[in-house]
Structure formats: C-alpha cells, structure tokens
Amino acid sequence: MREINVSQITDVIEKLCIEANEHLPEDVKCAIKTCRACEDGEIAKGILDNIIENFDIADNENVPICQDTGMACVFLEIGQDVHFVGGDLTDAINEGVRRGYDKGYLRKSVVKDPVRRGNTGDNTPAMIYTEIVPGDKVKITVGPKGFGSENMSQIRMFKPSAGLQGIKDFILEVVETAGPNPCPPMVVGVGIGGTFDKCALLAKKALMRPLDSQNPDPFYADLEKEMLEKVNKLGIGPQGFGGKTTAIGLNIETMPTHIAGMPCAVNINCHVTRHKSEVI
C-alpha cells in the first residue's frame, strides 16, 4: 500500500490546468501543420497560418491559446494499491482547478446551476472521471473542454439492425450539422458500445488519445482512417470557409454492449484539443 497526500493531487492539477491551456500537444500541432501543407485554397491556408501563429504565440508567451479556457475535465487512473491521505480527493481536485484558473488568469466559465445559472467564480466544480487500475501510481489527465464544440456533440441509441452503416452515417451527420460552429479543423471523438453514459465517456476519452495513434483493433483502426477521409470530403474546411481540412483527427473507442443495443456517441472538439497528463 502506497500513501499519497491529496495535496500532491492539488499541486499537479493546478499545473496541468495552466499548461494544457497554454501549450497544445505536439501531435495536435504536427497534425495542423501537416494539413496546412496539403491545403490548396488561399483562404484555408491563411486560416491555418493564423492558427499556427496563435499557438506559437501561446507557447512563447505562456498565454492561453483560446479565450474559452474550458470546463476542467479531470481523468484519474488510480492504482488499486494507493491510499489517499490528508483530506478529501474531490475537494483536492477542485482546489487544484481553482488555483490553476486563478494563477493562470484563465476564464471562469462554470455556472452553479444549469437552468438558473450564476457563475461559480473559480471554474469549479471539475468534471471528474476515475478508473481503478493495477499498481500504486496515479495518472492524472486534465482536458479543458470548450463548449463551442461540446454543444455540437451528440449521442444516438441505435438498434443493432442499424449496422455499421448507421454508425458511419451518424458520424458524418454530426460533423456536417456542426459545420463552422466548433471552430474547425476539429477533432472527432467517437464512442461505440456500453450504456448511454459509458458511450458518451468513451467518446470523450477518444479525444484524449494522441492523433498519431490508432485503435489497437485493425477493424476500428481502418474505420478511423475511412471516416476521417469522409469527414474531410465534406469540405467544411478551416473555420467553415471551405477546404480539405475539416478534421485533423478522428479517434474511436469501443466497449461491449447489450444484445439489444448499439450506442454511438460523437464528441466534437475544436482545433484547440487540449490535454496534459502526469503520473504520481
């Protein structure tokens, strides 16, 4: 049994909130630059040049990449041999978010109630997702999620008779409906299987995966490639002005499901696909 003081969790989350908002992952930057080299249209190339300039400035000056610094989504992979001491884990996570958004001068975007609103003033509470894994370590991932793209996301509870074609059509429908709203080029996270809630979580976890990775199952790896090509053929293009680059990545995550269902969720992210991780 390994003891970890929750103050360590707070410190790491504070740091990750700031870093994730100021520095895009290298795989995302590389994907954007690769797409820039493939674009033909002057408008599309100009927009991608602006995007590249923007994340370069954010890197060099340590400022947020986007004014929407997101709702803090915190993923914890907790080793089963870990015992947290020194306080409540949830409180420690929220304190890390509170400090990070204050210290980093990040916009506070969370309201107390979904209907009656009222800003909490510190970007808490975080959306917390935990998974118990073997070992005595804790992996923390912070993925700030903006809502221009989150609002474009959808889930559909298919019957198995919809088949693979139903899933393909749904992915394209969601992206086409989103159009310019999620600040393309976008990243598309797809979850297939599980229950209503688990399917949506799979789609969000797909957004945390590096864009230069692929699903370990060759069937779904091929589907990722096929659907990314089809999404880009929609021609929405950078910021919706047309072009070859509607999406810079499409990741699929799956899990077993009930014999009577085939849930599919599509979680859209903008080109500012932010996530940072650290292991304690």
Model-identified regions with their sequence ranges:
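Non-transmembrane, aqueous-exposed alpha-helical and coiled segments at domain scale
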Residues: M1-I280
